[in-house]
UniProtKB/Swiss-Prot annotation:
Pfam family name, one: Isy1
Gene3D superfamilies tied to this protein: Helix hairpin bin
GO biological process: generation of catalytic spliceosome for second transesterification step; mRNA 3'-splice site recognition
Gene name of this polypeptide: isy1
Renumbered residue ranges of the record's region Disordered: 133-157, 191-216
Keyword Nucleus attached: yes
Stated name of the protein: Pre-mRNA-splicing factor isy1
Localization annotation: Cytoplasm; Nucleus
Keyword Cytoplasm annotated: yes
SUPFAM superfamilies to which the protein is assigned, alphabetical: ISY1 domain-like
Reported function: Involved in pre-mRNA splicing.
Entries under InterPro entries matching the protein: Helix_hairpin_bin_sf, Isy1, Isy1_sf
GO CC, alphabetical: catalytic step 2 spliceosome; cytoplasm; post-mRNA release spliceosomal complex; post-spliceosomal complex; Prp19 complex
Keywords: Cytoplasm, mRNA processing, mRNA splicing, Nucleus, Spliceosome
Length: 243
């Protein structure tokens, strides 16, 4: 507490710039690559320190969970700093494998993408069983599978051999076959909905104008009508509470 008081006192007197000693929250506001490198290195030191501490046998399960959450939060912050460094034209630390190294070049186990479990967090109740079940099935841990699935969902689209059809710019509408198929399916869906019994509708539901065969076109309500409806609903709720 005394150190913080003295630091704040020095900042008020203009002796030190407290903005240089406190890590910025708005990472995208930092437009200097050396500054980003500095803060990234600080985050890596914190990660390395917490990964070492989570191995201690004296920690309770609650402390281990909190530490593991803090490490994952720092991992996300590290990724944000690396994104900012890359956007500013600096080195791309995200290129290559998902391995993570501290500021001294030592690999941090479990430091890939997604939520990870470090040290004794892998022995927590529920987590340990999850890893054992994955080992019995001969599969990788769930966290690694999630990372692999993320790549398969289009994360590596730049390396795939795709053409304009993949993005919906094909020529399948020029001959009219696709449009005819869509019209047929739309007609079948409308006939199916019309064939449904009225009793299937929930209480309080009303058909939209035009859907009930009254020939009235559906229109968006005005702002005044919406406000009037909301006021009316609130008034009804208040009356129900009073009664």
């Amino acid at each position: 507490m005394l150190f913080r008081f003295r630091a704040q006192q020095a900042a008020d007197l203009g002796i030190i710039d407290i903005g240089r000693t406190r890590r910025p929250k708005a990472i995208t506001s930092v437009d200097s690559i050396p500054s980003c490198e500095k803060w990234r290195g600080q985050v890596l030191k914190e990660i390395s320190r917490k990964v070492s501490r989570i191995q201690e046998p004296s920690l309770s399960d609650y402390q281990i969970r909190d530490l593991n959450d803090e490490i994952n939060k720092l991992m996300r912050e590290k990724w944000a700093w690396e994104m900012q460094i890359r956007n500013l034209g600096g080195p791309n630390y995200m290129r290559g494998s998902g391995r993570v190294y501290d500021d001294e070049g030592r690999e941090i186990p479990g430091g890939g993408k997604g939520y990870r479990y470090f040290g004794r967090a892998r022995e927590l109740p529920g987590v340990k069983e999850m890893f054992e079940a994955a080992a019995r099935r001969g599969r990788r841990p769930p966290e690694e599978e999630e990372e692999e699935e993320g790549k398969g969902r289009g994360g590596d689209i730049a390396t795939k051999k795709v053409d304009a059809n993949y993005f919906g710019y094909g020529l399948d509408e020029e001959d009219g076959s696709l449009l005819a198929y869509e019209r047929q399916k739309e007609k079948e869906a409308v006939e199916y909905l019309r064939g449904q019994k009225d009793s299937d509708a929930e209480d309080g539901w009303e058909p939209l104008p035009g859907d009930a065969g009254d020939g009235v076109e559906w229109r968006l309500p005005t702002l005044e009508e919406v406000q009037e409806e909301l006021v009316d609903r609130r008034r009804r709720r208040l009356l129900d509470k009073i009664s």
